[in-house]
From Swiss-Prot:
This is Enolase. It comes from Corynebacterium efficiens (strain DSM 44549 / YS-314 / AJ 12310 / JCM 11189 / NBRC 100395). Gene3D superfamilies: Enolase-like C-terminal domain, Enolase-like, N-terminal domain. Its cofactor is Mg(2+). It comes from the Bacteria.
Amino acid sequence: MAEIMHVFAREIMDSRGNPTVEAEVFLDDGSHGVAGVPSGASTGVHEAHELRDGGDRYLGKGVLKAVENVNEEIGDELAGLEADDQRLIDAAMIKLDGTENKSRLGANAILGVSMAVAKAAADSAGLPLFRYIGGPNAHVLPVPMMNIINGGAHADSGVDVQEFMIAPIGFDSFSEALRAGAEVYHALKKVINEKGLSTGLGDEGGFAPSVESTRAALDLIVEAIKKAGFEPGKDIALALDVASSEFFKDGKYHFEGGEHTAEEMANVYAELVDEYPIVSIEDPLQEDDWDGYVALTAQIGDKVQIVGDDFFVTNPARLKEGIAKKAANSILVKVNQIGTLTETFDAVDMAHRAGYTSMMSHRSGETEDTTIADLAVALNCGQIKTGAPARSDRVAKYNQLLRIEQLLGDAAVYAGRSAFPRFQG
């Protein structure tokens, strides 16, 4: 296999106008890979450390230190290593960093190189990235979890829940599911307009109307699904990313004008699941509320996917504890939460072996990089969350999945309803 010859990084811009790291890896056979690193708005306290410069430049958000760490340390460490040994390469960067959360070199520096190495190795092997990572059995296209109403930390809409998503489950192909999602998105704009509400967009391309409650937002989406000619629950289901750590203060959940305990929030979710065709609820409780997650999973986990994002932070150690305690039943997969592809692979593998589902995910600050689209297919996630069918930073991932589906031809299988085995709607 080709050896790593040169590693280089630069500072580029993300979709929120903030700097991020882009890494390039060149191999001795002329192959090369490039990768841009995403960044989140609502970040878990247990995430790998994103290194920022501080100071006045870019309001403290510059990443020149991370870029320097790639160009002056990581590149020298990896020179001469075989590019197809992803585990060895990632382990070398983790060892070089020397901290538990990648805070010395920066997870943004390490991840950029980790992804670029995989792309360079795929280029050298003459394979698309999904095939290089996933092997011959990578053929399942994920359900697009399309965030069409933005709230919480992603918008100024006033609603506490961060994301209201649609899941087009009743279709035979990814391309048809994407079409249906886009049609609902456009129908939703009309519904919002007709009610005299704002059609301004949040960070992830979803609308950010000022609505009074979670139910009001869900009602808008159900109306849009019907307006587009689809049946809620049969053709298109609903999903939530509550991001509840964002409104957890002083031991209480400050939700929709009241202060609630974990038990009370669990009852709120149970009622919503009974009233609406909801297949998935992400981060329903604060990220360290282990007892609450265990109780919630026991209460409604047999009929809805309970996803750990801030709760698990794509970390195999936290996931292992969750599996042992039967806390949640699904993991959100964000490569920059853990900082290397290898650790991401390990988390997804652990989840699937335990019967947990997995959802590949973008961040609210994205680039045109499409790595997560390939990863969703390679790792057989069955679900991908990468925003509304709007804004090029989101649509880039959907377009890559369309290319993958076309490349697979008759071998392509759309996950559809099978991605949500607990859903009875």
